[in-house]
Curated annotation (Swiss-Prot):
PANTHER family: 30S RIBOSOMAL PROTEIN S10 FAMILY MEMBER. Keywords: Ribonucleoprotein, Ribosomal protein. The keyword Ribosomal protein applies. SUPFAM superfamilies: Ribosomal protein S10. This is Small ribosomal subunit protein uS10y. SMART domains: Ribosomal_S10 (SM01403). It comes from Arabidopsis thaliana (Mouse-ear cress). GO terms for molecular function: mRNA binding; structural constituent of ribosome.
Amino acid sequence: MAYEPMKPTKAGLEAPLEQIHKIRITLSSKNVKNLEKVCTDLVRGAKDKRLRVKGPVRMPTKVLKITTRKAPCGEGTNTWDRFELRVHKRVIDLFSSPDVVKQITSITIEPGVEVEVTIADS
C-alpha cells in the first residue's frame, strides 16, 4: 500500500496551535420548551463557528413527588394531594478554546434554565 507524501509547508505559515478543550454545558429546567430553545440556540451558535458539537443528549427526567393530606385536621375521609416537580436535563459537549465558548454562551438564556459549564482538557 502506497502512502501519499505530506505536503511541505513554508516556515512561519503553520497554523497556530490553539489549546482545544472539551467543554461540557449542562442545562436543566422545569420547562421543556425553554430548555429546548436554549439548546437549539447553543448548538446553532456552535455550528456557525464551525465547532465540533456532540448533543444535546437528553438525560433522564427527575420526578420529585410529595403526597400530603388535604384535610388540615385529622378527621374526615382520607383524601390526598399528589404534587410533582419534573426536572429536565440536557448535556452538550463542545470541542474548542474557552474564549470561543464564552462568545457562544453570551446568548440570551430563557428564564428558569440553569446553565453549568465545565472545562476539561481533551
